[in-house]
UniProtKB/Swiss-Prot annotation:
Role, per record: Catalyzes the attachment of glutamate to tRNA(Glu) in a two-step reaction: glutamate is first activated by ATP to form Glu-AMP and then transferred to the acceptor end of tRNA(Glu).
Keyword annotations of the record: Aminoacyl-tRNA synthetase, ATP-binding, Cytoplasm, Ligase, Nucleotide-binding, Protein biosynthesis
NCBIfam families given in the database record: gltX_bact (TIGR00464)
Keyword NAD: no
Gene (UniProt): gltX2
Protein name according to UniProt: Glutamate--tRNA ligase 2
InterPro entries found in the cross-reference section: aa-tRNA-synth_I_cd-bd, aa-tRNA-synth_I_codon-bd_sub2, aa-tRNA-synth_I_CS, aa_tRNA-synth_I_cd-bd_sf, Glu-tRNA-ligase_bac/mito, Glu/Gln-tRNA-synth, Glu/Gln-tRNA-synth_Ib_cat-dom, GluQ/Sye
Domain of life: Bacteria
Organism taxonomic ancestry: Bacteria, Pseudomonadati, Campylobacterota, Epsilonproteobacteria, Campylobacterales
Database matches in HAMAP family: Glu_tRNA_synth_type1
Length: 431
């Protein structure tokens, strides 16, 4: 069982989407169920509407799920599991205040040591715990042995007990911490493989320790994906616009192109241009590079152009939403436009009212002739017929003709454009 477990706290990051795509591909390859779990236990950071937005984005990318969970609805199970650990003396109530802990952290810092919980409350007698009226958290006792796990990308990793420490699993308000909720849910939902960003590597031994302490002995496999760097080679921040999946979509980049690019990023793929369904046939998670991958927007735009060309004409017409059969014309313009947004602008320039500028007289002459001109199969015949009828020459012929047909004074060769614009010439002459 594979899962994607986002939090509804902001726009979906491309790193999160990459994890969703990889989990989905692996689930499909192994004919296993795929889980979508919304991790909403940090109520103060949740943003209204983001849960639905996550589902909408996944649907756009062709990612479906067989099971859907809301983490906060599992709260009773989190509390039951915490109580079990306390009753078995594997976890304990900690009454240390934030101020006390902060003072100990400062002391460790001055001594040049890494802070570790000193076990102040670990050996409190039961009667002392019962009689203490202070608020408390619950800590899981640190493991007694080295925690090891194998990662499909990073190989075997190990963590010593002192580096895991006795960590908090339940807060003072009786809600679970991220690691505890995540570990318990993965256990309850029978997740068998976790693919996520490498920023979670330090969480993995804690989650392994939680499940082991609860007596869960089913093996879990992992793949921690390297971080995505920006074009300057620095870790991509959520504040950077193109780190947001929503921004990429609103900019007119197709979901299929984003998927293609994210699968390629830091990976060895047999082809440069492919679909999600094609990738499912050959994708290998172990081939993903250990090294961070640099995001290249220009490369993504190049891939997007190729995916626009691959779209069926009726589907592209629907996306362009301009009430005309413009698919072939739009595909021709991918030599200049890289996104759906740019293509719409090109199409609007062609079919909207034009500014003729200094060529107003010439444009009027040509428009009258174009209203019922014979539409020859090849451009040379069309051009010669129009030249003869208009008596215009050189710049005073070609520039106004370009404005009428494209709405711009610059653009593709008219001879190249003609086969795609031919059927619209009579209409354009009447605008």
């Amino acid at each position: 069982m594979y899962r994607f477990a986002p939090s509804p706290t902001g726009d979906m990051h491309i790193g999160n989407l990459r994890a969703a795509i990889f989990n989905y591909i692996c689930a499909r390859q192994k004919n296993m169920d795929f889980i979508l779990r919304i991790e909403d236990t940090d109520k103060s950071r949740n943003i209204k509407g983001k849960e639905e937005e996550i589902k909408e984005i996944l649907n756009l990318f062709g990612i479906s799920w067989q099971h859907y969970y809301i983490q906060s609805e599992n709260l009773k199970f989190h509390r039951q599991m915490a109580l079990k650990l306390v009753s078995e003396k594997k976890a304990f109530a900690c009454f240390c205040t934030e101020e006390e802990l902060e003072a100990k952290k400062e002391l460790a810092k001055k001594q040049g040591k890494a802070y570790r919980y000193d076990g102040t409350c670990e050996k409190l007698a039961d009667i002392d715990v019962l009689e203490c009226e202070k608020s408390f958290v619950i800590r899981l006792k640190k493991p007694t042995h080295t925690m090891k796990f194998t990662d499909f990308i990073k190989g075997e990793l190990s963590f010593e007990p002192e580096n895991i420490d006795s960590f908090v699993i339940m807060r003072t308000d009786k809600t679970p911490t991220y690691n505890f909720a995540c570990a318990v849910d993965d256990m309850l939902e029978n997740v068998t493989c976790i693919i996520r960003g490498e920023d979670h590597v330090s969480n993995t031994p804690k989650q392994e320790h939680i499940r082991a302490s609860l007596g869960y002995d089913k093996a879990m496999t992992y793949a921690h994906l390297p971080i995505i760097l920006n074009e300057e080679g620095v870790k991509m921040s959520k504040r950077e616009a193109h780190s947001s999946v929503k921004w990429l979509l609103e900019s007119g980049i197709l979901p299929s192109a984003i998927t293609n690019y994210l699968i390629m990023l830091g990976n060895k793929t047999p082809y440069e241009i492919f679909t999600l369904e094609e990738a499912i046939k050959w994708f290998d998670i172990s081939k993903v590079s250990k090294a961070p991958a640099r995001f290249d927007l220009k490369k993504l735009l190049q891939i997007n152009r190729e995916h626009i060309k691959m779209i069926k004409d009726d589907e592209l017409n629907k996306i362009l939403d301009l009430n005309k059969d413009l698919a072939q014309l739009a595909k021709f313009y991918t030599q200049e436009a890289s996104t759906i947004k740019e293509l719409k602008e090109k199409m609007r320039a062609i079919f909207n009212t034009k500014d003729f500028g200094e060529f107003e007289t010439e444009c009027k002459i040509l428009k009258e002739l174009l209203k019922d001109i014979e539409l020859f199969e090849n451009y040379e015949d069309f051009k010669n017929k129009l030249l003869n009828k208009s008596s215009l020459k050189g710049k005073k012929f070609f520039m106004p003709l370009r404005i009428i047909l494209t709405g711009n004074i610059h653009g593709p060769e008219l001879s190249d454009l003609y086969p795609y614009i031919k059927n619209f010439i009579h209409e354009l002459a009447r605008i």
